[in-house]
UniProtKB/Swiss-Prot annotation:
The family this protein is said to belong to: Belongs to the quinolinate synthase family. Type 2 subfamily.
Binding-site list for [4Fe-4S] cluster: C100, C186, C279
Pfam families found in the cross-reference section: NadA
Protein name (database record): Quinolinate synthase
């Protein structure tokens, strides 16, 4: 018997262009695409983006863009929101595994039962939730406008606030309004150590603590200023302080350094020595994945039309009330 040996088929790995920034710019023109990036993305992605912002700003940009393709450098619920607002546009996400611990903390079936147990309650949901949760909501909010929106609700109207309990408590403290809170949270913003922040304050007495309202109350109590990522950026720009301890995902420090390079920015430390103050989901997106998403026009984010229409109404109410 004669056995013929066959060489294994060599699958050549696709090569990246030497000038990745230039190649992305070329694809952007070719596709009539816009790149939207969250402040928590890696610096290279922020540098190639057309717009960098927080959830509210990104939603507003997605609602107003004339581009045919939206490349969303963020996490899945953000790309979903862009698709809800733009059903006829293609929405690309560099990595479909870029989820969100806060969104995942609110399963739709469980939330439906929770909502049924609190009839006659108005549902205000933080934008960090799935399309299914948005579809069950009356109004969507972001950390930029949550206080403003709650203040517009008649005082006799009971409210469910979901999914972030820490943001909900902060809004309650700011408005004096009692709300029923869904007990969800962000793994990043719950990892900051109050004890280590105090130690940093002793080492850097000139530094102001600034924090995102998704942080726990103990961390917020130590903060000189509390606000959304955009509000934190604006505060740093206006403050005379030479240094800041930043209690949010450290990706935002890239923009802080660009706007105010002479100031010192210290990421708030987590309880242990890991990099748990970095969002593992945001970090799944890379410049290379962004390039391949544009080159292949995939992976694409889609939302079933029935869910999209139900989720669109509360998002539109948010944009109107903002």
């Amino acid at each position: 018997m004669i056995v013929f040996a066959t060489a294994p088929i060599q699958t050549e790995r696709p090569r990246l262009p030497q000038d990745l920034f230039g190649a992305i710019a070329d694809l952007k023109r070719e596709l009539n695409a816009v790149i939207l990036a969250h402040y928590y993305q890696e610096p290279d992605i922020q540098d190639v983006a057309d717009y960098i912002g927080d959830s509210l700003g990104l939603s507003q940009q997605a609602a107003s863009t004339n581009a045919e393709v939206i490349v969303f450098a963020g996490v899945h619920f953000m790309a979903e929101t862009a698709k809800i607002l733009n059903p006829d546009k293609q929405v690309l996400l560099p990595d479909l595994e870029a989820g969100c611990s806060l969104a995942e903390s609110c399963p739709p079936a469980n939330f439906a039962e929770f909502k049924a147990a609190h009839r006659n309650h108005l549902v205000i949901s933080y934008i960090n939730c799935t399309a299914e949760i948005k579809a069950m909501s009356d109004i969507i909010c972001t950390s930029s406008n949550a206080v403003k929106i709650v203040r517009q609700i008649p005082p006799e109207q009971p409210i469910i606030f979901a999914p972030d309990r820490n943001l909900g408590r902060y809004v309650m403290a700011q408005t004096g309004r009692e709300m029923v809170l869904w007990q969800g949270s962000c793994i990043v913003h719950e990892t900051f150590s109050e004890k280590k922040i105090i130690q940093l304050q002793l080492q850097h007495p000139e530094a102001e603590v600034i924090a995102h309202p998704e942080c726990e109350a103990a961390v917020l109590n130590r903060a000189r200023f509390i606000g959304s990522t955009t509000a934190l950026l604006n505060y740093v720009q206006k403050s005379v302080s030479p240094a800041f301890i930043v209690a949010t995902e450290p990706g935002i420090i890239h923009q802080m350094q660009r706007q105010n390079p002479d100031k010192l920015y210290i990421p708030a430390p987590p309880f242990n020595n890991c990099n748990c103050n970095e969002c593992p989901f945001m970090r799944l997106n890379t410049l290379e994945k962004l390039y391949w998403a544009m080159r292949r026009r995939a992976p694409e984010v889609t939302v079933p039309e029935t869910i999209r229409l139900q989720a669109l109404r509360p998002i539109q109410r948010m944009l109107e009330m903002s």
